[in-house]
Amino acid sequence: MAVPAAAMGPSALGQSGPGSMAPWCSVSSGPSRYVLGMQELFRGHSKTREFLAHSAKVHSVAWSCDGRRLASGSFDKTASVFLLEKDRLVKENNYRGHGDSVDQLCWHPSNPDLFVTASGDKTIRIWDVRTTKCIATVNTKGENINICWSPDGQTIAVGNKDDVVTFIDAKTHRSKAEEQFKFEVNEISWNNDNNMFFLTNGNGCINILSYPELKPVQSINAHPSNCICIKFDPMGKYFATGSADALVSLWDVDELVCVRCFSRLDWPVRTLSFSHDGKMLASASEDHFIDIAEVETGDKLWEVQCESPTFTVAWHPKRPLLAFACDDKDGKYDSSREAGTVKLFGLPNDS
């Protein structure tokens, strides 16, 4: 059964910095021109602003493909959609209908008006922001925790707590295929070419299936412990995985080899996001900061301070703006302010 990363303890490595790197990780010498340029940008754009979205903690944030809207899914059983106006998020609508927590959501890859939510109520719902209505409710067999939309827009894959992944036709809203796995399935994703399907699992492996045949292609031993999350870079060159060992590993898509690791976090890596140009990778955990690294060197580019563990991060598809949401469960902070907010980093300091 898939286990939320929040339930995991600190890294077995227990250290950050080069000393905790796996043997195959490499350290570069001196910051690149890109790193220096982005650091200069963030020095003037290091402001984080928070926006009230929900009445309980936010589990998932995602941008529409055109970057005009940000959606969030929450423990309060709703989704919210914001419009990005200059340097602020303006709440557009709240989407109700689920009977349990909205654990993950994603947008259609090329239609900026459609998004889909996965819930513990054993359904997924497709929403249209133009009508603000649910255009389809699809019943599934279990409590849903992971969802992704295929790059060609034709299929939605949803994973549940019982390690079943269901493939749903995005037009007919009917199940096309269903796979029961014998291992703990964590995050799921197609590759950018739409011809392979990737799963991260509780044994530290990345399982790759052909698509649409769903035949096993390869299993990669990526990490010594639970492999939690996976993201593909928009350029199609790399994918990254995050693990309970607190490491992020970067993989060459074509060669399926690990090219570098990022080891500045101490806790299980719960969420990853590549910037629109594929040059930055944000990773977050129960550490009270989000690490922003240069993809090509692994160098630290910036860190975003947080007051609590981070559930979800998402780079804007066109700008160096990072949306994220944190956990308020420890109650150390003013819960009325902290609960249910989405945060936006990269805003001008004088905004």
Swiss-Prot record:
Q: Name one GO cellular component term.
A: nucleoplasm
WD repeat positions: 53-94, 97-137, 139-178, 180-221, 222-261, 264-303
Residues bearing the modification N-acetylalanine: 2
Q: Which GO terms describe its biological process?
A: mRNA export from nucleus; mRNA processing; RNA splicing
Localization per record: Nucleus; Nucleus speckle
* InterPro entries (UniProt xref): G-protein_beta_WD-40_rep, Tex1/THOC3, WD40/YVTN_repeat-like_dom_sf, WD40_repeat_dom_sf, WD40_rpt
Q: Where do the segments described as Disordered lie? A: 1-20
What's the domain of life for this entry?
Eukaryota
Q: What Pfam families does the annotation carry?
A: Beta-prop_THOC3
Q: Name one GO molecular function term.
A: RNA binding
List the keywords (alphabetical): Acetylation, mRNA processing, mRNA splicing, mRNA transport, Nucleus, Repeat, RNA-binding, Transport, WD repeat
PROSITE patterns found in the cross-reference section: WD_REPEATS_2 (PS50082), WD_REPEATS_REGION (PS50294)
Q: What is its main location?
A: nucleus
Family membership: Belongs to the THOC3 family.
Q: How does it assemble?
A: Component of the THO subcomplex, which is composed of THOC1, THOC2, THOC3, THOC5, THOC6 and THOC7. The THO subcomplex interacts with DDX39B to form the THO-DDX39B complex which multimerizes into a 28-subunit tetrameric assembly. Component of the transcription/export (TREX) complex at least composed of ALYREF/THOC4, DDX39B, SARNP/CIP29, CHTOP and the THO subcomplex; in the complex interacts with THOC2. TREX seems to have a dynamic structure involving ATP-dependent remodeling.
Q: What's this chain's function?
A: Component of the THO subcomplex of the TREX complex which is thought to couple mRNA transcription, processing and nuclear export, and which specifically associates with spliced mRNA and not with unspliced pre-mRNA. Required for efficient export of polyadenylated RNA and spliced mRNA. The THOC1-THOC2-THOC3 core complex alone is sufficient to bind export factor NXF1-NXT1 and promote ATPase activity of DDX39B.
What is the recorded name of this protein?
Answer: THO complex subunit 3
Species of origin: Homo sapiens
**Gene encoding the protein:** THOC3
